[in-house]
Amino acid sequence: MNLITLIIMAMAMTTALYTINTYTTMKPDINKLSPYECGFDPLGNARTPISIQFFLVAILFILFDLEIVLLLPTPWSMNTNPSNTTILLITMLLTILTLGLLYEWLQGGLEWTE
């Protein structure tokens, strides 16, 4: 009996949500047509040039985001199989990323004004 009730409630909820979505009107207003937080015009040309500094910071963000993805499961893997190879690889990865960030900083790639 409970399974039938659950199926009926799911179908009723699906029908109600579909009906609400179908019959509500999409009215564009000034807030929906305005640029979002970034300040770019959403209806403008997609081929506008971007600054090199912005591009470099975006690439650095992606690299350090990838670093977090690679290093986040490390404590769990160290619990199952702690080895010197894992520690060496983590240390090498952090050293390479730190040296790259230091090089970028010394070259002035992180400066917004010139």
From Swiss-Prot:
Which is one Pfam family of this protein?
Answer: Oxidored_q4
Q: Where's it found, cell-wise?
A: Mitochondrion membrane
What's the chief localization of this chain? Answer: mitochondrion
Enzyme class label: translocase
Coiled-coil regions, chain positions: none
Under which EC number(s) is this enzyme classified? 7.1.1.2
Keywords on record: Electron transport, Membrane, Mitochondrion, NAD, Respiratory chain, Translocase, Transmembrane, Transmembrane helix, Transport, Ubiquinone
Signal peptide position in this chain? none
Example GO molecular function: NADH dehydrogenase (ubiquinone) activity
Q: Which residues cross the membrane?
A: 3-23, 52-72, 86-106
One GO cellular component term, please give it: mitochondrial membrane
- What is catalysed by this protein? a ubiquinone + NADH + 5 H(+)(in) = a ubiquinol + NAD(+) + 4 H(+)(out)
Instruction: Give the bilayer topology.
Output: Multi-pass membrane protein
Give the family this protein belongs to, as stated in its UniProt record: Belongs to the complex I subunit 3 family.
Q: What's this chain's function?
A: Core subunit of the mitochondrial membrane respiratory chain NADH dehydrogenase (Complex I) that is believed to belong to the minimal assembly required for catalysis. Complex I functions in the transfer of electrons from NADH to the respiratory chain. The immediate electron acceptor for the enzyme is believed to be ubiquinone.
The record ties this protein, via PANTHER family, to: NADH-UBIQUINONE OXIDOREDUCTASE CHAIN 3
Please state what the protein is called. NADH-ubiquinone oxidoreductase chain 3
